[in-house]
Every structure is written in C-alpha cells, then in structure tokens.
Amino acid sequence: MRSYLVRWASLVVALVTVIAPLAAPVPAQGQSLVPVPQPPYLEQAKAMLAGMSVNQKVGQLFIISFAGSDVLPGSDIADLIINYRIGGLQLKAANYNFVNGPDAPARIAELTNRLQLLAAQSPMPEIEASPTPTITVTPTQTAPDRRTATATPTNGIAAVTPTFIPLFIALNQEGDGAPYSEITQGLTPLPSQLAIGATWRPENAEIAGQILGSELSRLGINVLFGPVLDVMDTPKPGAPGDAGVRVFGGDPYWVGKFGAAFVRGVHAGSDNRIAVVGKHFPGLGSSDRNVDDEIPTVQKSLEQLKQIELAPFFAVTQIGAQPSATTVASDTGAVDGLLVSHIRYRGFQGNIRASTRPVSLDPLAYQALMSLPEIAAWRAAGGVTFSDALGVRGVRRFYDPLDLSFNARRVAQEAFVAGNDVLVLGSFGLSNSWPEQLANIKDTIQFFRERYVSDQTFAARVDMALTRILALKLKLYQGDFSPETAQVDVAGAAEISPSNDAVAAIAKESITLLSPSARDLPAVLSPLLRKDESIVFITDDREVKECSRCAPYPAIPRTALQDIALTLYGPRATGQVDPARVSSFTFSDLANFHGPVTETATAEATATPLPTPLSTSLTITDTPSITGTAEPASPGIQEAIAQADLIVFAMLDLNTQTPSAALFRDFLAQRADALREKRVVALAFGAPYYLDATEISKLTAYFAAYSRASAFLEAAIRVLFGEAPPAGALPVSITALNYSLLVQTSPDPNQVIPLTAANVVTPSQATPGPLELKVGNSLQLRAGPIYDRNGHVVPDGTPVQFVLAYPVERVEQQQAPVSTRDGVAEMTVVIERKGQVEIRAIAEPAQASYVIKVNIGDDASSIETIRPTPMPTPTPEPTVAPTPEPTATPTPPPEATDAESSNGGALGRASPQGFVLTLFALLATGLAAALALAAVTPIDLTRRWRLVLWSWSAGWVVYVLYAAGAPGMERIAAAFGWLGAAVLSVTASVAVLALALVFAGRQGAQSAT
C-alpha cells in the first residue's frame, strides 16, 4: 500500500510539473517556415558543367577590368575572351572603355554587343593545363578537354557542351554622377542613395531602380554592382572611410527596406535581365578607412554585426516560397549576388584579442557569415558571391605593408578558397600599367587551370562555384544561351529618354530643413523676396575628371543656382528676382578674404578617392587636378557680399583636405563679421553632417539636398523661395543638430496606438454589443500602425507590450514584449475567466492606445473599443518637418490601478519568471525538508520521501490554482506581483509538510504509549 501511494504521489508530481507551465497565458507567436527553393535552371547548369572543358570552367570564375575600347580580334580583350574564356568584364569610364557624351548609350550598346560576339567565337587550340614541377598529375585527375571529350552522363545528368556562354558585363552606377556612376550622360541623372533615403518612402527607391534597370538592360549591362547596403549609424565627416551620400541612411531597418525596394525595381525594369549584387557585405558602415587604400579593422563581434551591419543584407536575402523560373524571388527584393568586401574584425567570434583576416580572404570568417540562417537559405537558393576588386592597394598592403610586391596567384587563390564564387580582378597589378595587369590576369587563370587538373578538392570547389554562375546566367537569359539573346538594339539605346519627371518628384520629397525648426523658419527667412533685394550665390568649385585625358568639369557649375532662380523667378516668370541684383561666385573666390591660395586642389566628387584608371604604357594619376596656384579672386566678391541681402552657399562635402572646402570653413570662422545682419543660407548638395554646431549657428537657415543632380538644384531653389515645403527628413544622425536617429525612429509619445481584436467592432463603431465570447476563447490583438517621431512606421523589432487589466480585482498583467513588423505588433491572448478585462498596448515612450473592453457574463458577453485622448509628453522639437499629430476623441484616459502604481505593473500571475522561480523554490524547499527530516525526526527513508513528495505536489497544485485565476488569488498578485506564484506555492508546500509532521508525530506518540 505504501509503495502504491508513493508511486501515485510521484505521478501527480510529474503531471503537475508538466501542466504547470501551460497555465500561464503565453502569447502565440508562430513563424511560418518557408522551404528553401531549388535554384532555377540548376539541372540545366549541371548538364552544361558536365560538358565543359577545364579552360571553360576556370575562365568563368573571373570578371576583369580592362583598358581601352579596342575589341577587334587581335586585341587584348579579345584574347582574354576567346582563348582564356573569362566569365565577364567590368566597364569603367576611367579605363577608357567608353567616353561619356550624348551618344554614350549607343556606343556602350555597340561595345557590349561586340564583346558578347567574341564570347561566341571558337578559341585557338587550347593550351593544355600542365602542372608545375612540384605537382604530380595522375591520369584520373585530368579533366577532359572540350575539343576531344565526349559528353557523358554525370550523376544521371546528360552532359551538354555549350558553344556560347554569355559574359557578365558589370557596372557601378550608384547615382549622383561621377565617380560612382560610370555613365554620366545620356541616361536619367539619378540621385544619390542618401537623397532617396531622405524621402523615407521605399517606393522612391523602387522607382529609381526600375529606371536604372530599364536603361542599363537596353545597353547590354547584365550585372549591377549595387545598391550600397552599408549602414551609416555614426557619420564620420572627413574620415577616409566616410561614405557620404552613397548609403540610404543610418537605420538598419530602413536601409534594408530601401535596398529591397531598389532591387525589386531593377528586376522589374530590366525584365529580370540584370543581376543585382548588393555591397559591401558584411557592411562598411563602421569602417574608418577607405578599403581601396587600407584594410580597415572593426572591433565588433558577429552578434553585434547581426544587429546593425548585417540587418540590411538579411532584408535582401529573403527567399520567397515560390520563386519564378526567371528570378530568385524578386518579389521579395532578394539580390542575385553579394559583393564581399575587404574588411577585418576584432572579437568576431568573441575573443577580443583575435582578429580575422579580410573577410573576402578568410575561409573561417566567410563561412561563419554564410552559415547564418538568413544567408544560408539564400545561398542554398542559388545566391552568388563576388569578391571586391582583388588588386586594390588595401589588399596589396595587407600582404606587403610596403606595397613593393604583389603575388597575384596567392591573392586570387586565397579569395577563391575563402568561398567567393566570382573573382573580380580589378587593378590587378602593383602599378597602373595595363600590360602588367594583363600578364597577372593570364598567369592567374593558367595557375587555376593547373590547380583544377592536379587538385581534386580545388576542382570540386570550381565546379560548385561554376554551377551557381551558370544557373545565374541561365536565369538572366531564361535558359537560352544563343548569341542572339545577348544582343541589344543599338538604335533603341540611342533613343533612351531620361525620366526627369520621376527624379524631380523624388527631389521634391527629399529636401530637408536642418535648422532652424519649421516653426521658426518664416520669422528668420521670408520667402517673399523683393525685387530690390540682392542675392549672392557662392558655390563649391570642385571639378570632376572621369579619366586622365578627359576634360574636367565642375561638379556644380558656378552660375547653376543663379540660372535656375532667374528662370523660375526672373523677369520672364514672377519678377521676384532682378538679374542686375544677382551674382555668383565660387568658394575659391573667398580667398580674397584670406589671401592667395598656394595649395593644389584635388578634384573629388566625394571624400573617397576616384578609382585608379588603367594605362596602356604610362602610370596615370588617380585623382584629377583642377588648379595649381589659385587665380586672383574675382574682383567684386567683397562688394557683392557687403551689399547682399541674401547669401546662399552651395556645399558639397566639406573635406578639409580640399582647399575650396577649407576656404569656406575659414570664411565662416574668421570673417563672420561680413555676414552680420544678412540672411545666410547653406544648401548641402552632399552629405549634410560636415558643419559643426558653431558653424551652423552662424547660418540663418540650413537645408540638405543630398545630390548635385540638376533636379535637386531646382528643388532646393523652390524651397528657398517658399514655393515648396522642405518635405524630407534626415536619414542619418547629426550630433551638431542634436538629431539622433535612434530617438527619431522610436515611437512618437504623442500618438494614440490603434488597437484591434479579431472579429470585433472597429473604433468607428465603438458601441457595446453582444458577442459570443466565452472563457477559454482567444483574441487576436493587433496594435498599430505605430509611428515614429518623423511620422513614419517604426522599424521592425520595436518592442510593444499588451496590458490586460482587471478593474474589479484591481490587477494588471503586462504580457511579454512582442516585436513589430511593418509597424504592427500582434499577439493572441486567452480569455481566462468571467468578468471584465481591459486591454491596451504600450510602445515606450508611447503610452496611449485604444482600449478594448471585454465583459464575459453568465448569459451574454460584450466587447467595445474606446479611443482615449493622448497625454502629450514634452519633448524637444525635432529639427525636421513636424510630425502631424493624430486626432483623438475627448475620452479621458484610464487611470492606473493600485496594483500598477504600487508594483510598477506586475508581469502577471503566471509569467515565465514566476514559473522558473517557483520551480527552484520548491526544489529548494523539498531538499531542505528532506535534510531536516533526516536530522530531527526518527522517520524511515520511505516515509520521509513520501512527505517530501506530498509537500512538492501541494505546492504545484496551488501554483496551478494561482495561474488559473482561482478566487482570492488577485490579492496575492496585487501584493507580490509575479513573485506571488512562488510565495504561495512555497507556503502551501511548507504547510502540508508541517501538517504531515504533526500527524506523524502523533502517530509516533501513540505507538510509544
């Protein structure tokens, strides 16, 4: 009988231990698992691979940069394409592949057609891959040559010998002109990514991507190195690693949203004929060096990278459940490839003393990144990785800090073994000499051929990468590898009409007021200029040079703003501007206030140096020069400034290494007296974070335009004259303005969060009504959309808490926080018992939300939604356009319950914390009881453990009653919060143990008598 009771008690304990955690009302948060789709054209790619020669296989791994535009049969590039079977080329204006001009689109289309035709030509008799003297080749390791091998089945796949494999023809086209857009004439002058980010509308990124995809595909471009997915969480004005306007912004969520939208646009515009390669994986946002010059080292762990740098790449590697035959889930904005950057990390795997090699060259770091679930699924679906240019100075200095040698074979092999599928051989030599780089390219390809023949592991790695490459090319050409499919219509390319209206619309939405506030602007800068007022425009006069022999041109023409102002508001328009009272000068003219300039100005469109062009014989200067010793200052700038009513400075980036920018900053610092009692406006046509707080204080107004495209110059003038409002908002943090992106993207404290429940009335129908709700039913709650302080939906991952209040019992349960997605948080709660419950949502610092009142009675139930009046929290006014406040009905907000005020809001009667604490408390109580019984009572071992088990069971029974909301438990919850479960369970356990001891003692006494 005793053993029976012991077994029964043990069963009860086990049962309640399993059931107890289920008593807590845990939210249902399910995530649908999307199966990884098979890469499109995978089987066709495998069949082609089986029929390819060694030379064909190896050559496909390489994209090269080349010099000139000579593609005749005897040219260097023809030799590389026909005899070395290279897989692709990267076009650059700096390498004289084409000359920008009105006919550039047609000339580029002709060039790509001729390059693809070269790929269709048969090679000269192939040079057999011979091993180096130190390698022994066995017959079984020799791959069949394409000219002599017969197509044999491999793994059940019939081999197909390809006669033509289209070339990858790649391009950088980031927007905002040179140097990061190769084609600067004949196409739509797209803005910078930062300008698009300032609109906070991903739709604009999709529009820009669609325009770019449509135009580039008509030129025969099939690989786009972009968009830039780096996150500028902390701007670095003037630092070598400063990204300037090349990024979408500083918030990982929004960079990902814009990046995915841009990818969708390119895919749609090109009809899926362009492979989009996001860069610079895993992110250069924290870099303090220019990667092309020196490999940066960033002190971040992999976990830290996942929070910021990697988040946008996760957003563009989302694979849909059912991709089409021509794209890898393009509807999700998934990129086709990732450009792997040369960046190192300290503490990558947690050890702060250990540093990785550059990720592009480090197999361990590369595989750790590719093994992340978000990236692994994309890779499994056919995602291709491209190395960044392997010949840049930063890579050379990594191997030889003195930059005196360059081992081309080693660099290429280590980049390939690290995991890159495609090797980009850009600047592939110690100097800028094209003959030297050409020799390195040929030697490297021959070295890879030898390794393929002699090393089975290496050969398997080549086949794996080549399968991805072939599948991607098949996708671009819908499985049709015929020379005709790779040709484009040259006449159609010549007739491309720029989409200027679309760019103008983006410009209108991006112009941002930085200082003062929108409320104070009319008082200090009246847009109603009188005809008798004088205006002086002073423009940064840096020049851009696209190649060493190209004629330089100004980034912003000196009279550009003046011409726009006269066109819009001159005598032939509104008559607000008198041509005789408008004058234009340059930053160099400001030397008249400081003395002559003796430095040589470096022409840069941004703070990052221009890429190095190739030379056929001579070393070419990598940065163009605009002036030597400065010419005498324009005679009249002092008089013009003295007589001016409005002075407008047109800025690019203010890199102090550029003399023109230094002159402007010196002018603000040393001659602020010349600006006294004048309206002074600065327009930032580059990144807007270069001025410090003191410099900004000397300005009447400060606007950001982010781009020097003509549409943005016009939009800035329209805002200046009051014709259009500054509709944009800063996408990056600026310390000088006390503008924190983290604060601005947090929930607006003055909003009322919409809250709905499934199948209930909406706020517009907020009247009580009968509803069939019963105890045990579930309610699907939905809070949102939740907006940030700029009026946009909050980033994904913003925590939201649903609060269940029981007015009668004066108890409140705060559920575990859930994260938003697209500005909305969802949770399922269970109606636990009869009575009244009020449900609301909190997203700190936003406290006000709709209130859902649920009343469950014996015969009927009711539910209603009430919209309370928000309680504004005093916050500093942001420096951007004000956020429209949501309207609210005049219903007083619910008062806090006593339980909430005394406990700060309990987590609930059956929270996970309470369960864990109860579990350990009961274990400790049972152990203590067992030890105490052994020490103080003469009870045998069996009876002793029986008492412990009964006390343990009693504790769990009380816990279940507490979690289920048994009558009277509310008082315990109000007094102890989530500690109540443990307190009550331990008390019950001790009480049962004490009673058992008393009973056992009486039995012992009776036995003694």
Protein language model annotation of sequence segments:
Residues 81-104, 225, 237, 241, ...:
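Short acidic, glycine-rich surface-loop motifs adjacent to enzyme active sites
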Residues 59-66, 87-91, 167-175, 223-227, ...:
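Hydrophobic faces of well-ordered beta-strands that scaffold small-molecule active sites
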Residues 13-21, 391, 914-916, 923, ...:
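Hydrophobic core
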Residues 53, 73, 104-110, 114, ...:
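Second-shell residues forming the walls of enzyme active-site clefts
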Residues 29-83, 184, 399-800, 805-807, ...:
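Preference for extracellular/luminal or secreted protein segments
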Residues 834-846:
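Short, aromatic- and glycine-rich surface loops/edge beta-strands on solvent-exposed regions
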Residues 29-185, 513-516, 644, 939-940:
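N-terminal hydrophobic targeting/anchoring segments and the immediately downstream early-domain regions
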Residues 53, 89, 172, 201, ...:
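Conserved, mostly hydrophobic/aromatic
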